[in-house]
C-alpha cells in the first residue's frame, strides 16, 4: 500500500506505508513499526492510503 501526501503548493510524496495518523498537529505515516514521514498538518491539503502507485 502507498501513502500519498499532497501539499498546499501542489507537490506530493508517494511512499510505501500501511497506516496514517494525526497527532500533535502532525500527519504521521507508518510502514509497519517504522515512522516513514512526519509533516505539519498546516502544510497538507490531502493525505490518504492507496493500493496502487500514483
Q: What does each model-identified segment do?
A:
Residues 1-9:
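A short beta-strand micro-motif
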Residues 12-14, 36:
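Short, mixed charged/polar active-site loops
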Residues 11-12, 46:
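Short linear/disordered segments characteristic of secreted peptide precursors
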Residues 1, 52-54:
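Short intrinsically disordered terminal tails
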Residues 29-30:
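Core beta-strand residues in small-molecule sensory/regulatory alpha/beta domains
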Residues 18-20, 39-52:
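Structured surface patches comprising rigid loops and adjacent beta-strands/short helices at the edges
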